[in-house]
Amino acid sequence: MIEQQKRKAPGGPGPGPGPGPGPAPGPGPGPGPAPGAAPGPTPGPDLPLVPSAAKRPRHDPPAAGGGGGGGGGQPPAGALLQSGPPRCSSLQAPIMLLSGHEGEVYCCKFHPNGNTLASAGFDRLILLWNVYGDCDNYATLKGHSGAVMELHYNTDGSMLFSASTDKTVAVWDSETGERVKRLKGHTSFVNSCYPARRGPQLVCTGSDDGTVKLWDIRKKAAVQTFQNTYQVLAVTFNDTSDQIISGGIDNDIKVWDLRQNKLTYTMRGHADSVTGLSLSSEGSYLLSNAMDNTVRIWDVRPFAPKERCVKIFQGNVHNFEKNLLRCSWSPDGSKIAGGSADRFVYVWDTTSRRILYKLPGHAGSVNELAFHPEEPIILSASSDKRLYMGEIQ
């Protein structure tokens, strides 16, 4: 069922209360003008993240000498447009706040075309939003009777998949908002789902019942089931969708072969539960987020060396809330992002392993992050019931 909504993200330049993820993590304000210097028309380095004409005091005295580009000491026409970091996206403002959820937001994804996005969480609702303009919440998808733990669009964006604590996975028509299929078979919470990138529309799921299941949405029951013993918190396919990769509370990442119907190999290294998995766009590398406070990159190509962990990233944290903190790749693979319980948005450079951004703004755990498919925009979903979209360089 689809319901028209009137909720809006606050428009205009301001991001709402609290700073959102800004476009740069640099140092604080620079030094002010020298004593006695008249406030000139050129803005200093200590500018707000969001350029706003309203922030300029109306009683600015004219610059000494009344010169400059405009008469009477006024700044030249268009000077206010320069009053902040240069814009690098088509967002209405460098930071947009999306509020409308009534509970913790666990997951968020951009549509593959980049014009809309979906979010979901504890309130059992899936909200669809416009990325540009006022970021209107234009539709609500209702149908789950439990919290929605993970969302994924299929490759062409025609379908949206949602995994829920109501033990089901729903398949939605992303155009009409209708639920076209409900996949039943798990006996406990479904923590994760992931659709195949190509070929017949398959989807894999992982559950607290300790199983990993493969579904063909043209059929009613699961096509294959793998028994993992321990709760499964995250799943994904490999690039060719002939293997399912799973992570859970046994700390291991397991690769299941669909043709041979067996466990192919196990990747060990994490010292606590694996809460998020993400395959790189070209399919060679796997990203994992775990409760041992590390994010790791693994080589999942066939015939890779036995030690498949190639990089370890640190900075983000998990805590007693035990949220399923996810992770994601930028489209070109140059950056990764990981959820964190310390309320910051973490973005790392994959080559240098350096933290590029540690962005404040959220008042609760940051559960999932998503990179825009075409523009330098990052989306964050948090337990504070909000989402932020922010420009990054």
Q: Where do the protein language model's features map onto the residues?
A:
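Blade-level signature of beta-propeller repeat domains, shared across WD40, Kelch, NHL, RCC1
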Residues: 370-393
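Intrinsically disordered terminal extensions that flank WD40 beta-propeller domains
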Residues: 1-101
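A conserved positional marker within WD40/Gbeta-like beta-propeller blades
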Residues: 102, 125-127, 145, 159, ...
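Conserved strand-to-loop turn within each blade of WD40 beta-propeller repeats
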Residues: 119-123, 162-166, 205-209, 240, ...
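Loop/turn segments within WD40 beta-propeller blades
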Residues: 108-114, 151-157, 163, 194-200, ...
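WD40-repeat beta-propellers
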Residues: 126-130, 169-173, 193, 212-216, ...
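WD40/WD-repeat beta-propeller blade-loop signature
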Residues: 94, 104, 113, 137, ...
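WD40/WD-repeat beta-propeller blade N-cap
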Residues: 98-105, 141-148, 184-190, 226-232, ...
